Amino acid sequence: MVRRFKPAVKYRRGSRTHGWGRVGQHRKSGSSGGKGMVGFHKHKWSLVMKYGESGTGWPFYGKHGFKQPPTIAIEWRPINVGSLSDIIKELKKEGKIAEEGGKYVIRLLELGYNKLLGGGHIDVPVIVYTPAASRTAVEKIEKAGGEVRIIPLIHK
């Protein structure tokens, strides 16, 4: 479709200020009261009150929350029920899992995992020892005729 009007900038070409006044207007950050959060405690205080949470100045001022020290933070290494079902035969060949009463006994910590999640399907009855498991993972394993036993996780 044919344009009826040229873009405004085409008309402004050749003029020094493109319609923004005499000297240096509409440039850099002087026209906005400073860069970024400059002036939030002075001339931009009304913005803090308008957009901050209930007049407290949050999230503009103060420290919020905390970061756990790495010495006590737990690094989760999860595995899904479906992935566990896929590797059971390989683990049996390697001798990493035992069989007890027709059920495979799997200790996730020895395999390098510390959480069991509920993605996928399982149809083999297993007994899983793990520090943590999701509700759906427990339901799926119990539906297959197995059980999940929660063991304490000792972290450094």
Swiss-Prot record:
GO biological process, one term: translation
Signal peptide: none
UniProt keyword ATP-binding, yes or no: no
GO terms of molecular function: rRNA binding; structural constituent of ribosome
Family to which the UniProt record says this protein belongs: Belongs to the universal ribosomal protein uL15 family.
Subunit record text: Part of the 50S ribosomal subunit.
Function summary: Binds to the 23S rRNA.
Protein name per Swiss-Prot or TrEMBL: Large ribosomal subunit protein uL15
Gene that this polypeptide is encoded by: rpl15
